[in-house]
A protein has these predicted regions:
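Conserved radical SAM core fold
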Residues: 9-11, 55-57, 88-93, 105-126, ...
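Generic alpha-helical secondary structure signal
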Residues: 26-30, 60-63, 93-97, 117, ...
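Conserved alpha-helical substructure of the radical SAM core
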Residues: 1-97, 102-105
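Hydrophobic faces of well-ordered beta-strands that scaffold small-molecule active sites
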Residues: 46-48, 82-86, 107-109, 148-154, ...
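Long, contiguous hydrophobic alpha-helical segments, chiefly transmembrane helices and signal peptides
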Residues: 17, 50, 84-85, 111-113, ...
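Short, surface-exposed linear patches
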Residues: 69-74, 104-107, 128-132, 173-175
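Structural recognition of alpha->loop->beta junctions
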Residues: 96-109, 170-181
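Radical SAM enzyme [4Fe-4S]-AdoMet core and its adjacent flexible, acidic
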Residues: 119-200
Length: 200
């Protein structure tokens, strides 16, 4: 896993992240690129999983390292795959295409159903669900030449039985096989406010 940043732009009550304003420095970026260049001949495969913090907050760092890997791949011929776990708020279609072009083809984005705006608010307190859905709908308009995979992770609280959320997602993405849904129970991952939530 690669953690280019620890800062987040959401304030989820179940979040275990430290919310520190720490971003990968340019020196560290160069060290990572040199390390990959020096080590890649020893391996046939390279996989990078971008995590955080919220990775889309440091788009340029990810593009820098990923572009280096793509350039290396044209010369040294190794298999390369990259994934990203993101809240999707900043992942508009323009950013998505940039990531796609440097080899990031798989994304996991968490949506908390109809409770999303309460459990996954922006740091400023504003709603986030509508913007994420809009981003995903626009990404879905990309032609079939864009072969990507987006996993929509649905975190559910104990007793959450409103299945209309799945009907809603189905109406948006069921015809696009590049989208899939992962259902997961919210657990005590160490968030400071998780005790106030109905979890199993």
């Amino acid at each position: 896993d690669a953690l280019p940043i620890l800062e987040l732009n959401f304030r989820c009550p179940y979040c275990y992240e430290p919310h520190e304003n720490i971003t990968m420095t340019s020196d560290i970026v160069e060290q990572i690129k040199k390390y990959i260049q020096n080590m890649i001949d020893k391996f046939d495969n390279l996989q990078i999983s971008w995590f955080g913090g919220e990775p889309t907050l440091c788009e340029n760092i990810i593009l820098d390292i990923s572009s280096c890997v793509k350039e290396l791949q044209t010369v040294r011929k190794f298999n390369y795959a990259a994934t990203m776990t993101t809240n999707g708020y900043l992942l508009n279609i323009e950013m998505f295409i940039k990531f796609y072009e440097v080899g990031i083809r798989s994304f996991q984005i968490t949506l908390d159903g109809w409770n999303h705006n309460e459990t996954r608010p922006h740091i400023s307190g504003i709603r986030t669900l509508e913007r994420i859905i809009d981003n995903l709908r626009k990404i879905s308009t990309l032609s079939s030449e864009y072969e990507y995979n987006i996993i929509i992770r649905h975190n559910i609280l104990d007793g959450d039985q409103d299945f209309s959320w799945y009907d809603y997602l189905s109406s948006l993405f069921a015809k696009d096989k590049r989208f899939s849904i992962l259902v997961a129970l919210v657990s005590d991952w160490g968030g400071t406010l998780v005790g106030s939530m109905p979890i199993s």
